[in-house]
């Protein structure tokens, strides 16, 4: 609210207290404001609306504030509510409010009849205490407007007693702050004053005592959420006592409950009420809501981490519930606050925010006590056992192991294995995880069982000191008990709890009483601890219900997230209901669960309204009345579903009776005369959700959900064919004509008689049914598809059908509808396996009997069906098995096994005798896994309390549960890999609550994944027997009885079979199953010898360690061996010996072996001392020498230089024969790759397997969204060390989410082709997609050719286009036979991560485009017109001769007589070149030039260690430039000139862009177009040419400055000495350095300019320039975002449209001069390299070391040596082939030639000359002359008229500097300029005389040499020059 008040004085800078307001109010002379003061506070009285309005005016005037926006509406609403009542009482008009509030905003309360003025209280702002302060005048004004009580003596808020002081007359209204008064007949805040400190009442008849049964029963009702029997007075009375207890410690409520409990009581009541409307009746509900809203406003913008911390530390339930509300709101709207917030909050829900603070302390303390007990008590004779202890310790062996330890991976393996082997822990080390679980459990169990025994022993052993030391009345024990309370509950006890502790300890005067006291304390601590947990759950539920609001969760994603969090919270509450220690709070927990259930139900309903469904199948049974249509409808319904059908009646407007069953019957659906049934049917038979109209509250949101709809009608044509709704109606239904010939004949023959029953049959053979064709509205006609013929078209005759045909038709149509409908993810888990056994028709019965016998023998769960696939799988827990003939069509979702009838005849008795090995009897090849799946698959999870012995499966394992560890170990057999982790969690839960085993198992089964193996385990527990059977799903039986049952069937005797009857029937299994059994056997063998295997492996690693050993050769150990043994016993290998000898010989050193090894180690570790550097240089040369493969020898050379040792090659080097070139690339083409990935390195994340092995890669594209390949994700389990979620496959392409993405993201595009592979090399491809066979299956992609050899593990790396956007992913190569052939999977279109910032853009890829004057554009809806007019005026001195000037102001539009053309047309013409991208250099040539330029800059540019922060980056911008397309005006227009602070518009925009940039995500790259106001040559004006201005978005500019400001500054600092002259001072000594470089001996000079430079810049070159800048940055996400943004196509916004460029580089792009110059260098270098290589020259040196360049954007001077000079014509032709247009500097069409030494060089429109004063860069003379012709003034269309007012100061400075420049051209030209200057003095009013020629010459030279302050600014700073000394070109 603070931002809603505009202050004009300094009063807002200080806190404003109510006391100061009170003082000023008492001093006011306004008669309409009546004030009085008394002991309880300071009060206001408004006798009518005029007084209230006067008070508002006083606040405005006294504190100099102006309410507006939200603050004004808030204040005025409350004033209006007050005035409406006062108007009714006084009759005074309230029209004065209309100037503040619109009529639609006025909220008029309805006053109750008969109420007096004093009974109406305004719910308002409450203040209590003298120190109350307000942050803003808005809050103060609101408090004053609605009334307040200011307590000078900290008195309680309440009704004012009789006034003291000035009396108040009339029907005055006291606007006193009491938020709860409106909620009660007797306000508890007011009636609390009537309660005494002891709990009694001053008026016992009104308010009962605290101990009264009404108070107690009321509290119970609140906790049980059953408040229907409570009266309003009951609420008020309870709240009054609670308020008194919170303010007075002596109230008896504090003896029963603490203050935390009192607030907890209200929290529970509020959280337990399901409907928010019911909460208004709670005590102090309004104040509670106000408190939470206040916390929400204060904390909503705080970072998430701070909220988490506050949540864990806060003891304020209001603050905590407000924080939970904020967290739930942000997590629901995760797409606005990132998925990380949602995942963190889901985890936070599972935590208890008030856990025991001493969990680890307790574990450590108990562990210490256990060890101390072992040494002191359990070991009575430690001296006698000391030798045994030493022998067990084995200190000698341990010391040897430690001494031989090495701090390496291998060293740790050896050491740990040796220690484990030494102490016999090897098996323990192998099975470490289960042992840790067991030990931890035992330790924690011991800790919980010893608390009581320790206290008892302590009291027993020290009983003699009881009277003196254990006086429990001593305060020390209270403090000790309080400390224990803190350790147990996490909270220090308050007064009430301390009183309870004191009362308990006071009676502990004996040992027994002491033990009893300790037990009571333990129970109290446990209860208090649980109170905090329940309170924490209540605050979560309150926050959850506040988030369950359509204004908070506005879209389906937010609703889904809220439902997930509600389900998580419900699970947490559910676990507490299973905990016995929480049984006293069970009613409260159940109420909390009910509230969460209501939130879940509400979310589910909202999702159902937004979730697409499968369209139901609808038929209409038409025929005459009484023929049996309704009976037929119910018969069809019974065959379609086992459920009873739902019934709808369309004659009523509400459908509360609809039950949502699978079949719905609508009888006589068309009986409504208004034809409303048509729209109902169209909406019902649809994939969109259908919301039913229901009256009951609980049915609101009910949707139609039936699968099949059967309607009846007596009308042959329900909808006339001429109706506009006939086509959609008949397209959705199928009509079946039903007639009963027997009944009709009887009725005609026997009129008036009842139809006999024998005319009807149960199989409906009495009916004649004919199904019409699709779209038939009658028996012979169908709807015309185009609706032109009302009579329709001739249709096919009806098809005769029976009931079974109708049922099959409806089932088939529904399955087809499902195929067209994407089912929700997650339902696949309940998919039923289906097996089809196909045989000859005559053998179907035999196969059926064999399978039925096998099912009976082995108690299989599958359903067996013959000759049909129609089975209701919803009623079967197992798989579905079908036996069909080979003439039957088999559905695609069945596993097919074809039976061999010869095998059945060979062993027909096998299955009938035993029922086993049915595979041999059927002659099918079937794996054991399929057999297990078929027999024992369990669909879903089932819990059965009723146990029938004949239904129980046979046991595989029987486990007697002695501890939870036994349970966990047995459950391990049942679990899948992910389920094992859930088992560990179950162990912890069962440890915490071991007495609730059956209930906990039920809860645990809901979210557990079970193994695909069939396992049955019987658990014998103290409370009974549990039988668990699992196979994908699970069944569980629980009983309190003991069951004694035999063991089950082993694997060898199960349906998997084995060898029977002397191997007459061996099982026939696939080869894959045999391989699986072999690997299983190997694993079993290894498990038997795993200990020995580890020991042998460690021994091998130990033996491989470096050990001193003798390597002497020959018969003696002398010679070389003796030398090698020198050096302090160090032994060298042969290679090390040779290195030591060669190094000493070549460096002429006498280095010992020890010194040599030390030097080698220092060099290897990267030391930078002289010796290490020298050794690395020598080592590199030696390696290069040996890499040739030729022999070398050390020789001694004796010559003039003395004796020296050298290495000579002794073998002749032969030139290799060049292979014959062919189209097939050879192996040598792949040796240049260094394997370094260069494309979007920070956005590429690894995909790893379960054990951490590398599988491939994925690419992060922003907001946690990633793309990869299907075969990579199918193999890999983790992406960036986390599980991928929401995985979707589009062919081979996979896109998914990860919760913790990398810091950067890569841009993607769907409409381009790759030009570079992941390693930066060029790609050759036609980019035509097709299907290719690979080792990972068929893939749809394109073939690309690159010169990079790839290897397994490279799949998923990105290929990019010219702009660096990802267009495809690497999926495979041609292997060794064709390594250059790659398959690339294109990135197809899918929904990119949404973001509110990205939605704020003018060009949207998904939006439609239009053609606008030849450009493809999108409409923006915002017309940003191009600015008309010019600021240039003709000087008064040249009104008559301005035509003599070579330049004039640029074209002004269609009204300009010089060339009438609209400004929009000029913009369009300028954008034409941007429609097509220029070619640019070949990728491999550009890469080579890029690497050379980077190598050139490496020693010159320091690498930045960090990027600029947002504020620093903005400070580096020119604030006089445009803000871009989103914000109007210039940057300085949005900055406070005094404070420098940004306004809200600029701050919000930059913050939004910056938040994306910090994630590495590209931001919109858009520009506001304008036309440059400048002087142009008259020949340009004659053809309407005018240059564009690209106004860059300020957000893009800030991000670019943050990323590249330091690098660009470093480049500008070298402008005098390097290739880029941006920032150089052309009027200083730097030009002398340039001049020397120009005339380097042996070089040639070329001056070059370019036409249309900006629009012809190749995108791939710009991308490489940005990569070069990135190379010298910190490569942070902000840098990645800047590169991706500036590389993306720029968007031009103008005239209500936006245009997407395909090439070019906008002149307004950030760092445009630097980027243009880098582009210039890369283009020239690429052209030289390409031309030289085309001549057969291998450019293996850095080309930039041999040439010199001057570049500033498109201006260039090339200084080249002789060999480059010889090919310069081809270089310029090559530049033209790139799409550039190089020209001479004079813009003539002549070829570009070398500049002779006799001619001056022109650069930046200056000529380099040498005069008597030195080297000067002369400005063009015409540029100086035209300064006299034109003056800048106000914008005008009549530029030929002089300006009305001339800024003489600026004009004088401009012309003075012109004269200084003119002095450099000689006396004659200076005299000419002097004449112009004198004319200006005469006509323009300039007073300052021009300097003489000598004065001007001396001043310029002084400025040039730096003697005086220079006003001549360096090049590149045109923005300052235009503002000060203007030189218009």
Swiss-Prot record:
One example of the protein's molecular function in GO is: cysteine-type endopeptidase activity
Q: Where do the catalytic residues lie?
A: 1271, 1292, 1355
Q: What is its EC number?
A: 3.6.1.15, 2.7.7.48, 3.4.22.66
Q: Which residues bind ATP?
A: 623-630
- Site (Cleavage): residue numbering on this chain: 176-177, 468-469, 825-826, 1111-1112, 1232-1233
Q: Domain Peptidase C24: where?
A: 1235-1391
| Domain SF3 helicase, residue spans | 597-753
Name the keywords, alphabetized: ATP-binding, Covalent protein-RNA linkage, Host endoplasmic reticulum, Host membrane, Host-virus interaction, Hydrolase, Membrane, Nucleotide-binding, Nucleotidyltransferase, Phosphoprotein, Protease, RNA-directed RNA polymerase, Thiol protease, Transferase, Viral RNA replication
Where does the RdRp catalytic domain start and stop, copy by copy?
1643-1768
What are the BP-aspect GO terms? DNA-templated transcription; proteolysis; viral RNA genome replication
Q: Can you cite an annotated GO cellular component?
A: host cell endoplasmic reticulum membrane
Residues carrying O-(5'-phospho-RNA)-tyrosine? 1137
The protein, known as: Genome polyprotein
Q: Which organism is it from?
A: Canine calicivirus (strain 48) (CaCV)
From which lineage does this chain's organism come? Viruses, Riboviria, Orthornavirae, Pisuviricota, Pisoniviricetes
């Amino acid at each position: 609210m603070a931002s809603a008040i505009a202050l004009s004085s300094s009063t807002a800078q200080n806190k404003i207290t109510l006391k100061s307001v009170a003082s000023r109010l008492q001093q006011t002379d306004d008669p309409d404001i009546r004030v009085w003061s008394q002991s309880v506070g300071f009060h206001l009285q408004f006798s009518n609306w005029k007084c209230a309005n006067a008070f508002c005016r006083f606040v405005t005037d006294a504190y100099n504030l102006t309410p507006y926006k939200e603050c004004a509406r808030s204040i005025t609403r409350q004033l209006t509510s007050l005035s409406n009542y006062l108007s009714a009482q006084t009759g005074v008009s309230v029209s004065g409010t209309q100037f503040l509030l619109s009529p639609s905003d006025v909220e008029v309360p309805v006053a109750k009849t008969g109420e007096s003025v004093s009974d109406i209280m305004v719910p308002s702002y409450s203040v209590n205490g003298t120190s109350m302060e307000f942050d803003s005048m808005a809050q103060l004004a609101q408090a004053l407007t609605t009334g307040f009580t200011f307590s000078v003596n900290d008195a309680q808020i309440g009704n004012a007693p009789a006034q003291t002081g000035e009396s108040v007359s009339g029907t005055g209204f006291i606007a006193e702050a009491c938020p709860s008064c409106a909620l009660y007949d007797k306000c508890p805040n007011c009636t609390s004053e009537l309660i005494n400190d002891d709990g009694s009442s001053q008026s016992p008849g009104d308010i009962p005592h605290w101990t009264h049964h009404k108070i107690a029963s009321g509290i119970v009702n609140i906790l049980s959420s059953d408040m229907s029997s409570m009266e309003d007075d009951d609420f008020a009375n309870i709240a009054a006592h609670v308020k008194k207890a919170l303010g007075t410690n002596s109230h008896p409520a504090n003896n029963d409950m603490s203050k935390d409990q009192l607030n907890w009581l209200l929290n529970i009541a509020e959280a337990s009420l399901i409907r928010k409307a019911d909460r208004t009746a709670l005590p102090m509900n309004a104040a509670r809501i106000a408190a939470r809203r206040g916390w929400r406003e204060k904390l909503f913008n705080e970072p998430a981490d701070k909220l988490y911390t506050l949540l864990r530390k806060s003891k304020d339930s209001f603050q905590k519930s407000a924080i939970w509300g904020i967290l739930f709101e942000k997590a629901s709207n995760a797409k606005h606050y990132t998925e990380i917030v949602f995942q963190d909050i889901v985890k936070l829900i599972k935590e208890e925010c008030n856990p025991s603070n001493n969990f680890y302390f307790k574990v450590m303390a108990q562990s210490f006590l256990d060890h101390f007990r072992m040494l002191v008590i359990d070991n009575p004779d430690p001296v006698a056992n000391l030798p045994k202890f030493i022998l067990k310790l084995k200190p000698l062996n341990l010391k040897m192991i430690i001494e031989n330890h090495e701090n390496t991976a291998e060293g740790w393996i050896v050491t740990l294995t040796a220690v484990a082997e030494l102490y016999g822990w090897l098996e323990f080390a192998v099975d470490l995880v289960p042992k840790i679980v067991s030990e931890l459990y035992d330790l924690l169990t011991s800790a919980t069982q010893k608390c009581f025994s320790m206290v008892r022993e302590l009291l027993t052993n020290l009983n003699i000191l009881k009277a003196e030391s254990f006086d429990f009345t001593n305060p020390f024990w209270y403090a000790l008990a309080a400390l224990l309370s803190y350790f147990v509950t996490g909270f220090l006890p308050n007064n009430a709890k301390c009183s309870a502790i004191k009362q308990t300890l006071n009676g502990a005067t004996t040992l027994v009483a002491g033990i009893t006291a300790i037990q009571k304390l333990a129970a109290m601590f446990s209860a208090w601890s649980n109170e905090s947990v329940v309170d924490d759950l209540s605050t979560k539920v309150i926050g959850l219900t506040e988030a369950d609001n359509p204004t908070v969760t506005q879209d389906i994603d937010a609703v889904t997230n809220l439902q997930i969090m509600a389900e998580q919270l419900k699970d947490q509450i559910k676990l507490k209901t299973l905990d016995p220690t929480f049984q006293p709070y069970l009613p409260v927990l159940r109420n909390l669960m009910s509230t969460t259930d209501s939130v879940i139900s509400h979310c589910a309903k909202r999702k159902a309204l937004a979730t697409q469904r499968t369209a139901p199948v609808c038929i209409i049974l038409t025929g005459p009345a009484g023929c049996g249509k309704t009976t037929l409808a119910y018969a069809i319904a019974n065959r379609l579903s086992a459920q009873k059908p739902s019934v709808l009646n369309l004659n009523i407007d509400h459908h509360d009776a609809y039950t949502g069953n699978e079949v719905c019957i609508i009888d006589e659906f068309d009986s409504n005369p208004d034809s409303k049934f048509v729209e109902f049917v169209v909406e019902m038979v649809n994939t969109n959700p259908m919301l039913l109209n229901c009256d009951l509250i609980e049915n609101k949101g009910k949707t139609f959900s039936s699968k099949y709809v059967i309607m009846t009608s007596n009308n042959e044509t329900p909808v006339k064919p001429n109706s506009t709704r006939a086509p959609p109606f008949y397209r959705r239904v199928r009509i079946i004509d039903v007639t009963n010939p027997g009944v009709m004949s009887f009725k005609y023959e026997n009129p008036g008689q009842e139809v006999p029953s024998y005319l009807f049959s149960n199989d409906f053979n009495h009916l004649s049914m004919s199904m019409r064709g699709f779209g038939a509205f009658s028996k012979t006609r169908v709807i015309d598809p185009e609706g032109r013929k009302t009579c329709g078209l001739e249709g096919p005759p009806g098809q005769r059908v029976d009931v079974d045909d109708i049922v099959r038709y409806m089932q088939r149509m529904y399955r087809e509808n499902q195929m067209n409908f994407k089912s929700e993810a997650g339902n696949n888990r309940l998919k039923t396996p289906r097996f089809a056994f196909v045989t000859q028709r005559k053998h179907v019965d035999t196969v059926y009997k064999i399978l039925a016998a096998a099912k009976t023998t082995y108690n299989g769960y599958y359903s067996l069906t013959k000759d049909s696939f129609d089975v209701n799988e919803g009623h079967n827990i197992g798989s579905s098995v079908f036996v069909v003939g080979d003439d039957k069509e088999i559905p695609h979702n069945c596993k097919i096994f074809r039976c061999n009838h010869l095998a059945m005849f060979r062993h027909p008795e096998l299955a009938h005798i035993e029922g086993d090995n049915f595979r041999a009897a059927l002659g099918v090849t079937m794996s054991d896994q399929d057999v297990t799946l078929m027999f024992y698959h369990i669909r879903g999870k089932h819990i059965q309390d009723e146990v029938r012995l004949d239904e129980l499966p046979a046991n595989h394992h029987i486990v007697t549960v002695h501890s939870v560890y036994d349970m966990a170990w047995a459950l391990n057999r049942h679990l899948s890999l992910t389920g094992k982790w859930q088992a560990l969690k179950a162990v912890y839960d069962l440890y915490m609550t071991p007495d609730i085993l059956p209930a906990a198992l039920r809860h645990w089964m809901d979210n557990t994944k079970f193994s695909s193996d069939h396992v049955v385990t019987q658990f014998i527990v103290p409370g009974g027997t549990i039988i668990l059977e699992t196979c994908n799903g699970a069944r569980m039986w629980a009983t309190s009885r003991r069951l004694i049952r035999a063991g089950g069937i082993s694997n060898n005797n199960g349906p998997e079979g084995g060898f029977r009857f002397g191997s007459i029937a061996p099982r026939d299994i696939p080869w894959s199953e045999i391989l699986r059994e072999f690997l299983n056997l190997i694993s079993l063998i290894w498990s038997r010898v795993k200990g020995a295997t580890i020991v042998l492996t460690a021994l091998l690693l130990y033996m491989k360690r470096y050990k001193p050993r003798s390597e002497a050769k020959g018969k003696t150990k002398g010679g070389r061996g003796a030398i090698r043994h020198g050096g302090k016993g160090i032994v060298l290998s042969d290679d090390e010996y040779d290195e030591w000898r060669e190094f000493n010989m070549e460096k002429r050193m006498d280095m010992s072996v020890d010194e040599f090894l030390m030097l080698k180690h220092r060099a290897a570790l990267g030391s930078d001392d002289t010796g290490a550097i020298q050794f690395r240089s020598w080592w590199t040369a030696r390696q290069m020498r040996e890499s040739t493969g030729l022999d070398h020898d050390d020789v001694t050379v004796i010559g003039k230089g003395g004796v020296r040792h050298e290495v000579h090659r002794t073998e002749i080097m032969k030139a290799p024969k060049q292979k014959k070139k062919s189209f097939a690339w050879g192996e040598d083409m792949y040796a240049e790759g260094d394997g370094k990935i260069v494309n979007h390195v920070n956005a590429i994340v690894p995909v790893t397997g379960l054990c951490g092995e590398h599988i491939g890669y994925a690419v992060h594209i922003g907001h946690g969204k990633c793309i990869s390949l299907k075969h990579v994700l199918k193999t890999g389990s983790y992406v960036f060390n986390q599980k991928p979620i929401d995985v979707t496959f589009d062919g081979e392409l996979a896109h998914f989410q990860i919760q913790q993405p990398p810091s950067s993201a890569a841009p993607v595009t769907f409409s381009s082709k790759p030009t570079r592979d992941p390693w930066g090399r060029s790609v050759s491809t036609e980019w035509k997609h097709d299907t290719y066979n690979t080792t990972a299956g068929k893939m749809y992609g394109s073939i690309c050719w690159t010169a990079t050899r790839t290897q397994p593990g490279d799949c998923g790396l990105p290929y990019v286009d010219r702009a660096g956007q990802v267009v495809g992913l690497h999926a495979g190569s041609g292997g060794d036979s064709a390594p250059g052939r790659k398959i690339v999977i294109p990135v197809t279109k899918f929904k990119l991560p949404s973001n509110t910032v990205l939605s704020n853009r003018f060009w949207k890829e998904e939006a439609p485009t239009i053609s606008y004057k030849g450009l493809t554009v999108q409409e923006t809806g915002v017309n940003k017109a191009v600015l008309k007019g010019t600021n240039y005026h003709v000087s008064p001195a040249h009104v008559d001769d301005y035509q003599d000037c070579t330049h004039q102001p640029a074209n002004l539009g269609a009204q300009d007589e010089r060339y009438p053309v609209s400004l929009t047309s000029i913009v369009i013409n300028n954008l034409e070149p941007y429609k097509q991208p220029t070619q640019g250099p070949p990728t491999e040539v550009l890469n080579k030039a890029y690497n050379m330029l980077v190598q050139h800059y490496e020693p010159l540019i320091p690498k930045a260690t960090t990027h600029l922060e947002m504020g620093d980056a903005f400070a580096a911008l020119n604030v006089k430039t445009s803000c871009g397309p989103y914000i109007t005006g210039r940057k300085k227009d949005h900055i406070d000139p005094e404070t420098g602070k940004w306004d809200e518009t600029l701050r919000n925009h930059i913050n939004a862009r910056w938040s994306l940039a910090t994630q590495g995500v590209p931001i919109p790259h858009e520009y506001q177009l304008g036309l440059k106001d400048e002087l142009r040559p008259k020949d340009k004006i004659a053809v309407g040419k005018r240059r564009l201005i690209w106004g860059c978005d300020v957000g893009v500019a800030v991000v670019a400055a943050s990323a590249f400001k330091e690098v660009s500054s470093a480049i500008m600092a070298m402008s005098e000495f390097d290739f880029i002259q941006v920032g150089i001072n052309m009027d200083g000594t730097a030009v002398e350095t340039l001049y020397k470089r120009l005339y380097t001996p042996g070089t040639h000079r070329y001056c070059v300019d370019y036409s249309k430079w900006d629009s012809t810049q190749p995108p791939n070159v710009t991308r490489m320039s940005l990569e070069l800048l990135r190379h010298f940055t910190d490569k942070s996400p902000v840098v990645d975002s800047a590169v991706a943004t500036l590389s993306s196509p720029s968007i031009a916004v103008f005239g209500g449209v936006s245009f997407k460029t395909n090439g070019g580089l906008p002149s307004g792009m950030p760092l445009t001069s630097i980027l243009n110059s880098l582009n210039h260098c890369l283009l020239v270098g690429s052209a030289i390299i390409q031309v030289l290589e085309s001549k057969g020259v291998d450019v293996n040196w850095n080309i930039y070391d041999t040439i010199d360049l001057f570049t500033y954007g498109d201006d260039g001077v090339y200084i080249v040596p002789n060999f480059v000079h010889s090919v310069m014509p081809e270089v310029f032709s090559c530049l033209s082939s790139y799409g550039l247009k190089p020209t001479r500097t004079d813009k003539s069409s002549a070829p570009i030639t070398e500049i002779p030494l006799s001619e001056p060089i022109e650069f930046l429109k200056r000529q380099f000359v040498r005069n008597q004063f030195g080297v000067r860069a002369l400005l063009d003379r015409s540029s100086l002359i035209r300064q006299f012709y034109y003056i800048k003034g106000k914008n005008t269309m009549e530029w030929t008229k002089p300006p009305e007012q001339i800024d003489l100061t600026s004009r004088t400075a401009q012309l003075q500097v012109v004269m200084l420049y003119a002095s450099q051209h000689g006396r004659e030209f200076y005299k000419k300029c002097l004449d112009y200057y004198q004319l200006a003095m005469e006509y323009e009013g300039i007073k300052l005389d021009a300097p003489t020629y000598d004065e001007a010459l001396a001043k310029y030279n002084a400025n040039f040499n730096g003697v005086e302050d220079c006003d001549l600014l360096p090049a590149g700073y045109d923005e300052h020059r235009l503002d000060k000394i203007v030189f218009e070109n």
